[in-house]
Amino acid sequence: TGAQSLSIVAPLDVLRQRLMNELNRRRMRELQGSRIQQNRQLLTSI
């Protein structure tokens, strides 16, 4: 039973890590996107 529970837990940990990585990537992309938009607004307002 120990081996079975381990085989179930390991993939879950991998999935969780992938989810966290994906969320972080999206967050960084959104931050960069908003920064670019702010720069564009600054350029157009000048």
Swiss-Prot record:
Cellular component, GO, one term: extracellular region
| Chain coiled-coil ranges | none
**Residues modified to Isoleucine amide:** 46
> Would you indicate the residue range of the signal peptide?
none
- Where's it found, cell-wise? Secreted
- The reply to whether Secreted figures as a keyword in the UniProt entry is yes
Give one GO molecular function term. Answer: hormone activity
Q: Which UniProt keywords apply?
A: Amidation, Hormone, Secreted
Which PROSITE patterns did the record assign?
CRF (PS00511)
Q: Which cysteines are joined by disulfide bonds?
A: none
Q: What is its main location?
A: secreted
Answer whether the UniProt record assigns the keyword Secreted to this protein.
Answer: yes
> One short Pfam family name for this protein?
CRF
What protein family does this chain belong to? Belongs to the sauvagine/corticotropin-releasing factor/urotensin I family.
Function per UniProt: Regulation of fluid secretion. Stimulates primary urine secretion by Malpighian tubules and causes a dose-dependent stimulation of cAMP levels in the tubules.
Q: Write the protein's name.
A: Diuretic hormone
Q: Which species is this UniProt entry from?
A: Acheta domesticus (House cricket)
